[in-house]
């Protein structure tokens, strides 16, 4: 039994997540981390609470995999793995914060997630957004089957109207795919992840090959 207990403790240690922020961590003096919502190649998204306003929020942390490390049992600071990667990290952080500024321009648009704050801390950067309570369009289709063209048009109307405003500002969203669209419990539909948005006058050959997502990329990219 002692051996089994030790094995169980070892297994729990191995499974423990040491790189994301721990539950209860406070950011910027007001945002309390509650849970990890998801993780991608460039960041970690948390569910949190704004102590000042008393509302639930989503907090996106710039955490590019393979470039940084953190041991949350010691502190919350993110460390760049190799000195030669520092420039890459800093450029990425600048673009990450620019994402916040881009989304904030469209906070009055019903079909786009709202940004409420952004800041730097722990040697990295954070974007605070409204918490979206629902499922992605991808998940909805997996559960309910393919939607008719009529249903899709009705569902996507707020997003399409918001994208029209985005395009008027000289920006395009490079990934309007089902996993980037949230269907909320209150019936609203929101487009997420504006890290895939950029000025459509600034396409280079290299960036096109990296970011073009067949089937979901805007036609401006195919013409560039």
Regions found by a protein language model. Name each.
Residues 118:
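Activation-segment/catalytic-loop signature of the eukaryotic protein kinase fold
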Residues 122-136:
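Conserved short submotifs of the Hanks-type protein kinase catalytic core
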Residues 160-171:
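Protein kinase catalytic-loop region centered on the HRD/HxD motif
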Residues 137-147:
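AlphaC helix of the protein kinase catalytic domain
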Residues 207-221:
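Conserved activation segment of eukaryotic-like protein kinases, specifically the C-terminal portion
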Residues 73-105:
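AlphaC helix of the eukaryotic protein kinase fold
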Residues 155-156:
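Activation segment signature within eukaryotic-like protein kinase domains
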């Amino acid at each position: 039994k002692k051996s089994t207990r030790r094995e169980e403790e070892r297994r729990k240690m191995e499974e423990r997540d040491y790189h994301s922020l721990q539950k209860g961590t406070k950011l910027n003096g007001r945002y309390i981390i509650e849970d990890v919502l998801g993780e991608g190649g460039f960041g970690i998204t948390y569910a949190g609470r704004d102590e000042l306003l008393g509302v639930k929020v989503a907090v996106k942390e710039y955490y590019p995999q393979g470039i940084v490390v953190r041991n949350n049992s010691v502190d919350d600071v993110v460390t760049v793995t190799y000195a030669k990667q520092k420039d890459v990290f800093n450029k990425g952080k600048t673009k990450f914060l620019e994402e916040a500024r881009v989304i904030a321009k469209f906070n009055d648009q019903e079909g786009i997630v709202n940004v409420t704050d952004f800041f730097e801390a722990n040697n990295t950067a954070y974007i605070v957004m409204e918490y979206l309570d629902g499922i992605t369009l991808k998940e909805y289709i997996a559960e309910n089957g393919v939607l008719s063209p009529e249903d899709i048009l009705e569902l996507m109307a707020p997003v399409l109207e918001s994208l029209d405003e985005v395009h008027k500002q000289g920006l395009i969203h490079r990934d309007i795919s089902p996993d980037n669209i949230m269907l909320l419990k209150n019936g609203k539909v929101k487009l997420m992840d504006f890290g895939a948005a950029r000025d459509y006058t600034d396409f280079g050959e290299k960036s096109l090959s990296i970011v073009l997502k067949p089937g979901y990329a805007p036609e401006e990219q195919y013409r560039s």
